[in-house]
């Protein structure tokens, strides 16, 4: 199955082949700020699953608060939508903003990262694997 992720203005698009390797929500400050929401929702694919990229992309590179690797975040140069990212600590994987896909193309998240930082009002689907829970 081929899936297409698009930015808000439609100038950027990314085609992906196959199923994601990971479907996760993250509650860290970085993901909350990236999305402007209570958490970030991401899907990860092997680099070879990325078929095509189109549109004007801008790069923002930084070291995450964890200090692990360097993240390269790509967003639409026209509208600012975060499209995808890579991290030197996870070679061969491309993370993508799940909200850029049509909602029916992805199932619910299967992992909740840094769950101890989750907003108290956020509930998760049954069966989600939790890491980083509060002590």
Name each model feature, range by range.
Residues 1-135:
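A short Gly-Trp-Pro
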């Amino acid at each position: 199955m081929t899936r297409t992720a698009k930015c808000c203005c439609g100038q950027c698009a990314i085609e992906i082949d196959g199923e994601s390797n990971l479907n996760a929500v993250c509650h860290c400050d970085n993901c909350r700020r990236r999305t402007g929401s209570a958490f970030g929702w991401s899907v990860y694919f092997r680099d070879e699953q990325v078929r095509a990229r189109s549109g004007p992309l801008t790069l923002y590179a930084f070291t995450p608060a964890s200090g692990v690797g360097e993240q390269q975040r790509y967003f639409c140069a026209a509208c600012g939508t975060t499209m995808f990212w890579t991290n030197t600590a996870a070679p061969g994987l491309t993370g993508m903003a799940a909200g850029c896909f049509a909602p029916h193309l992805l199932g619910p998240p299967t992992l909740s990262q840094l769950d101890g930082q989750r907003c108290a009002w956020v509930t998760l689907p049954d069966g989600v694997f939790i890491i980083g829970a509060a002590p």
